Design a protein with these regions (language model features):
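Core nucleotide-handling region used for phosphoryl-transfer chemistry
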Residues: 2-518
């Protein structure tokens, strides 16, 4: 068994990796703090603890770290010191401080009082130095130090070895830039999701999205949308001469719809039904089972990870918004979906009286919404049955032509916003290919207000809300994948909402391995 590995529910956006510390940049107003970058993530470090070239472990922002690891390294904050390995020592210091408080409540001279206060404060300060800064939930959150954002957590091999001694034997170079979420067979890190507020729903638990389709024997072929990985961790996949499409990442809720083959039950004789029950119950003579269905094309739709058609998924409820926004969106496009065609899109605006994403109206009035298709797949016309993945520009052209032919859809269907189509070498000609091209191009994109409006307000919204970010896809990519780059201002706002315990449907659906969503 590998000491560092990936679990079945591994998510690249919420994991750990071994990295080499890059350039340390001074931070104005501080003699001992410095800024470095892990991919696109800014992180603040102490110059006396972290040096350029060090090999360290990095935990992504908004992760939840293993409680035993935090305890072994005394990383829980003073408010939950009982979770730390040195809890007894900290308790003794706090009790000593409390005894000073008791003495202060008695009659004492001014000199004695000052001495007791100093002694009390020393005990409290010492107790605090023996604790960390993680809250009880072990969440890695974005903070600002000297106005510099710090996203993620760096820790050493020695720290991890306190939790898992076997780590002492690994060669860090062998794992450089490798992602993992499991240490020696135990889940070490996962996405942090605050306690979910109750919504009207019913149904079962999530597993991997595409695996869940198998439970619905009426669907013959269906694919949920793949996870969009972080560009920072995949920038090495992009070559300077790759033709890429960079589009606006909008903040809504996912919808998947397609006209796919489904099995529709048909009536058969009683004795045939009886025989089929025997076959199904005992799992024998499967080849002699009577056919009790017809195969037809039907429109099926889902959220990011849950089939929504009630005749297929009988346990599905109205969902997070108490209103089937996914059906409403599908009804708009259903008449124009061809056989074996699947459309992946984003729904933005309002679900009746509820904003789909708080603060992100995208120009919609209350009760209004629109669908933005961003991905389409069909079958190749060579008879092979192979899936054909459309390029982003083809998706945009299809949407624009649809609206042109059916102008009544103009308010309900919006084409994807493409910021750039071409090579990154042409976009950033001043970035030398021979000198750390990937790292430097990533930095250019992170700060590109001219082409992408990074860190700016989203002009599509009436409210003052920051742009979420951008999505990059390689044209004619043999792999179905896309990469996202989120704005720091958006991430900071998202972190503030998580602090309040506000969880949107995308977070529930995408990051709760065992969450529910109907």
């Amino acid at each position: 068994m590998k000491i560092l590995s990936k679990s079945e529910n591994f998510k690249q956006e919420y994991c750990c990796s071994i990295i080499k510390v890059g350039t340390l940049k001074p931070i104005e107003g501080s003699d001992f703090l410095a800024q470095t970058f892990i991919g696109d993530a800014s992180i603040v470090v102490r110059k006396d603890q972290v040096k350029e070239g060090d090999l360290m472990f990095y935990a992504s922002n908004e992760c939840q770290l293993n409680e035993k690891f935090l305890s072994a390294n005394n990383l829980f904050e003073i408010g939950c010191y009982e979770k730390n390995g040195n809890a007894k020592e900290v308790k003794e210091l706090l009790e000593a401080a409390e005894r000073c408080e008791v003495e202060l409540s008695k009659d004492c001279t001014e000199e004695e009082g000052e001495s007791l206060r100093n002694e009390r404060d020393e005990y409290k300060a010492k107790a605090k130095t023996k604790c960390g800064f993680f809250s009880y939930n072990g969440r890695v959150r974005m903070i600002r130090l000297k106005k510099t954002p710090s996203m993620g957590y760096l820790f050493s091999k020695e720290e991890l070895a306190k939790y898992c001694p076997k780590v002492k034997d690994i060669n860090m170079e062998d794992y450089l830039n490798i992602d993992f979420d499991t240490v020696d067979g135990e889940l070490f890190v996962k996405a942090y999701v605050p306690p979910v507020k109750e919504h009207s729903r019913r149904g079962g638990k999530h597993n991997k999205r595409d695996k869940k389709v198998k439970q619905f024997d009426r669907i013959i072929e269906w694919s949920f949308h793949y996870d969009t990985d972080m560009l920072a961790k995949n920038i090495w996949k992009i070559r300077p001469d790759d033709v890429v499409t960079i589009s606006n990442k909008i903040h809504g809720t996912s919808v998947v719809m397609g006209k796919v083959k489904t099995r529709n039950p048909k009536k058969i004789a009683f004795y045939k039904r009886l025989w089929n029950n025997v076959v199904d119950t005992f799992g024998i003579f499967k080849n002699s089972r009577f056919i009790d269905y017809t195969v037809d094309y039907d429109v099926v739709y889902s959220s990011r990870g849950v089939i929504k058609n009630q005749y297929i998924n009988e346990n599905v409820g109205p969902g997070y918004y108490k209103f089937d926004i996914w059906k409403e969106a599908t009804d708009i496009l259903a008449p124009y979906i061809e056989e074996d065609m699947m459309i992946y899109g984003e729904i933005c605006g309002w679900a009746e009286k509820t904003q789909i994403q708080k603060g992100y109206d995208y120009g919609c009035k209350q009760g209004e919404f629109f669908v933005m298709p961003y991905r389409i797949t069909t079958k190749k016309k060579d008879g092979s049955g192979t899936k054909y993945e459309w390029n982003v520009d083809e998706v945009r052209q299809w949407t624009e032509n649809l609206v042109k032919e059916h102008p009544e859809l103009a308010e309900k269907v919006h084409p994807i916003t493409i910021f750039y189509h071409g090579t990154l070498a042409d976009l950033y000609p001043n970035v030398k290919v021979s000198e750390h091209w990937h790292e430097n191009v990533l930095q250019e994109m992170m700060n590109d207000k001219e082409h992408f409006g990074m860190e700016e307000l989203e002009p599509m919204c009436k409210n003052k809300s920051y742009r979420e970010g951008i999505v990059l896809r390689i044209d004619d990519d043999p792999f179905a994948e896309a990469f996202k780059l989120k704005c720091k201002n958006f991430l900071q706002k998202e972190a503030a909402l998580i602090d309040k315990g506000e969880v949107d449907i995308e977070m529930q659906d995408a990051y709760c391995n065992n969450g529910e969503e109907n």
